[in-house]
Amino acid sequence: GVLSLLKKFTMILKHVHVN
């Protein structure tokens, strides 16, 4: 669903921000 996609996107964004 949309929530799952948003969650995934947030995780990726977080990962990029950390690196």
Swiss-Prot record:
Localization (cell):
Secreted; Target cell membrane
> What tissue specificity is annotated for this entry?
Expressed by the venom gland.
Question: Which regions form coiled coils?
Answer: none
Keyword RNA-binding applies:
no
One cellular component term (GO) for this entry is: extracellular region
Superkingdom of origin organism: Eukaryota
The family assignment reads:
Belongs to the xylopin-like family.
Q: What is this protein called?
A: Antimicrobial peptide Xac-4
